[in-house]
Regions:
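Residue-level signature of catalytic and energy-coupling elements of molecular machines
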Residues: 48, 92, 164
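Conserved functional loop/turn residues at catalytic and ligand-binding sites
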Residues: 37, 51-52, 59, 71, ...
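An extracytoplasmic/periplasmic, membrane-proximal ligand-sensing/linker region
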Residues: 27-31, 68, 113-176
């Protein structure tokens, strides 16, 4: 349908992560999206619920209540693995599209930080991220835990930066 017809795709703002994610999905699939930018995801979700737009690109946490109530349906996730909260929903990769885009969070320190301090911080935060309280919080808020060491996280940032730069260029946006 989306390859033959334009789909109005709401997102959280021009150049925002979910605008870029939808652009990546369109690029990979050949779908035609009319990007409808909002000031945050809430307006896009409200307009989707009111059937004023056809779809949204947002994090699952932002729509979980509507999915659980049956008001919205998730077609695919842009993560590299399925989400525990919606295990029957495939990833884009499983659907045949190389789209792994989204948000992440991490801890950074100055480059001059001694290695032993970096290792201690990694261990402290790694242990905390595996604690029952944190895992429970992340599960309840429908977020994914992906613990990476410094070099792995740096690789992820660099790879994502390359992807997002290409999407920004494709969209004709200026990096500021």
């Amino acid at each position: 349908y989306a390859k033959e017809n334009e789909v109005s795709m709401g997102n959280s703002g021009n150049g925002a992560i979910w605008h870029l994610a939808a652009a990546g999905l369109a690029k990979e699939t050949g779908a035609k999206f009319k990007h409808v930018a909002y000031d945050g995801a809430a307006g896009a979700i409200t307009d989707l619920l009111g059937e004023h737009i056809d779809a949204v690109a947002v994090s699952y946490a932002e729509v979980a209540n509507y999915v659980e109530s049956g008001d919205l349906k998730v077609l695919a996730v842009m993560n590299d693995k399925r989400l525990d909260a919606i295990p029957d929903v495939p990833t884009c990769k499983e659907a045949g599209y190389n789209v792994v885009l989204g948000t992440w969070r991490g801890l950074g320190v100055p480059a001059s930080t001694p290695d032993y301090v970096v290792e201690q911080l990694y261990q402290i935060f790694s242990d905390a991220a595996q604690s029952d309280a944190f895992v429970d919080f992340m599960n309840k808020s429908n977020n994914v835990i992906d613990i990476m060491d410094g070099p792995s996280f740096e690789d992820r940032i660099i790879a994502d930066l390359d992807t997002y730069k290409a999407l920004v260029t494709d969209l004709g946006l200026k990096i500021q």
